[in-house]
Curated annotation (Swiss-Prot):
Residues that hold heme c 5 according to the record: H275, C314, C317, H318
KW Metal-binding (keyword) present: yes
Gene for this chain: nrfA
Main location: periplasm
UniProt protein name: Cytochrome c-552
Organism, scientific name: Salmonella choleraesuis (strain SC-B67)
Pathway connected to this protein: Nitrogen metabolism; nitrate reduction (assimilation)
Binding site for heme c 2: C160, C163, H164, H301
NCBIfam families the record matches: cyto_c552_HCOOH, PRK11125.1
Taxonomic lineage from the root: Bacteria, Pseudomonadati, Pseudomonadota, Gammaproteobacteria, Enterobacterales
Residues annotated as binding substrate: Y216, H264
UniProt binding sites for heme c 3: H94, C209, C212, H213
GO terms, molecular function: calcium ion binding; heme binding; iron ion binding; nitrite reductase (cytochrome, ammonia-forming) activity
Length: 478
């Protein structure tokens, strides 16, 4: 009866920037090679779908920024040599998708369309303009070049055309018209035996979210987005896949380990949990059916915590009261957090001990099995913690991954102790003071004053040019 009830209730200054920047970006005018049907301006659909649009717009209320590095400075060491050691904030509302990727220190401070540390692929989950560009340029064309190339093009926040076929008759008639607007996501679903077009309505609801809330990597010369699901979606399956192709996201600057960085694997972890196994979808919990002022039901697009809409979400299946379920979730969250910190402590020591071994003259052959253990330990830890809701989606799987991460980290440290002893080092390897984010960043050699200054200059000069160009090209509303 509870399941039947659930199914019944479903559904961004400066005006005159520097001339050289102006000239660089003014050359970027869109050339449409194909017929483009994706309308990326979300406000276009407000008259037709007012309740959905206003609730989507309300994600701007989710404006608080939580600095994960300040909260847990160990992360700086684990990501030494990678942009995440500069800046890592917890996610906030969809209305900030474009703003946040522009403002994060991870994307650097490019001055031209060919400048900067990251590829175009870093826009891929931020805007319906991505779907528009893929349709216009093809996947290879979209992925080609640096992240800054997309600045004047990708300007509308994650919204309608990311999940809905807004050009379809069904959408015009008020139906969801769900779609996978990223072809690479469609291929990934097929790889795990879930072709989108053959999936049922409930499966499609989660698959649409799974275009972005997933683990992915940048493949080949073009740095195209690919999901590592060829061997399956469990942490070991993806680890095996990455090892087989000898892939690494970066090399840790302390231990010289070829590392893997997990992204936001909510689809994978949800699939492994009790809700996923029972096909309780992302929409059921995060986008419930609610009533407008006239009593008409619509799908709430202010994606958020299910407890904020308890009667329309959890209570559809659970008989416990809100306080009881909150207590259960809090206990699971604390258990995962406690084990997470223990694994991080082991990994921090392992990275510094590996550095000491290299400094003492260790060879590549001696270090290879150790670095492999560090790689696998941190990968398993990261896949567990990068999914911010794992304590709700799959707590048992989270604890299992963290447990295996602890075992791998212990294996690495045991081998390091033996290797260091052969080099005449039997004392404990001391750690620098990493008690704050700032001290940890100093310990790995980051010049944060320079990095921050360059970013502020970028935001004051380049970004306004992007927006001006987008308005001239009709990509942003005036």
């Amino acid at each position: 009866m509870a399941r039947k009830t659930l199914r019944a209730r479903r559904f961004f200054s400066l005006i005159f920037p520097f001339f050289f920047i102006t000239s660089v970006y003014a050359e970027q005018t869109p050339v449409s090679a194909k017929t483009v049907t994706v309308e990326a301006k979300n406000e276009t659909f407000a008259p037709q779908h007012p309740d959905q649009y206003q609730s989507w717009k309300a994600t701007s209320e989710q404006s608080a920024r939580e600095d994960a590095l300040a909260e847990d400075p160990r992360l700086v060491i684990l990501w030494a040599g990678y942009p995440f050691s500069r800046d890592y904030n917890k996610p906030r509302g969809h209305a900030y998708a474009v703003t946040d990727v522009r403002e994060t220190l991870r994307t650097g401070a490019p001055k031209t369309a060919e400048d900067g540390p990251l590829p175009m692929a870093c826009w891929s989950c931020k805007s319906p303009d991505v779907a528009r560009l893929i349709q216009q340029e093809g996947e290879d064309g979209y992925f080609h070049g640096k992240w800054a190339r997309g600045g004047p093009e990708i300007v509308n926040d994650l919204g309608c055309a990311d999940c809905h076929n807004t050009a379809s008759d069904d959408f015009a008639q008020g139906k969801p018209a769900l779609t996978l607007s990223r072809p690479y996501a469609e291929r990934a679903m097929e790889a795990i035996g879930k072709p989108f077009e053959k999936a049922g309505r409930f499966d499609q609801q989660s698959m649409v979210c799974g275009q972005c809330h997933v683990e992915y990597y940048f493949d080949g010369k073009n740095k195209a987005v690919k999901f590592p699901w060829d061997e399956g979606m469990k942490v070991e399956n993806m680890e095996q896949y990455y090892d087989a192709i000898a892939f690494s996201d970066w090399t840790n600057s302390l231990s010289k380990t070829p590392m893997l960085k997990a992204q936001h694997p909510e689809y994978e972890t949800w699939s492994a949990g009790i809700h996923g196994k029972n096909n309780v979808t992302c929409i059921d919990c995060h986008m419930p059916k609610v009533q407008n002022a006239e009593g008409k039901l619509y799908t709430d697009h202010k994606i958020g915590n299910p407890f904020d809409n308890f009667a329309q979400t959890c209570a559809n299946c659970h008989t416990q009261d809100k306080a009881s379920l909150q207590k259960v979730v809090a206990e699971r969250k604390q258990a995962i957090h406690d084990l997470k910190i223990k694994v991080e402590d082991q990994l921090v020591h392992a990275h510094f001990e590996a550095k000491a071994a290299w400094d003492a003259g260790a060879t590549d052959a001696e270090m290879k099995p150790i670095l492999n253990d560090i790689r696998h330990a941190q990968w398993r830890w990261d896949l567990a913690i990068a999914s911010h809701g794992i304590h709700m989606h799959a707590p048992e799987e989270g604890l299992r991954m963290l447990g295996s991460a602890m075992d791998k980290a212990a294996d690495a440290r045991t081998k390091l102790a033996r290797l260091l002893a052969t080099k005449g080092i039997t004392h404990e390897i001391p750690l620098p003071d990493i008690s704050t984010k700032e001290k940890a960043q100093k310990a790995i050699g980051l010049n944060m004053q320079q990095i921050n200054a360059e970013k502020q200059d970028f935001l004051k000069t380049v970004v306004p040019q992007w927006e001006d160009q987008a308005r001239k090209n009709g990509l942003l509303s005036q």
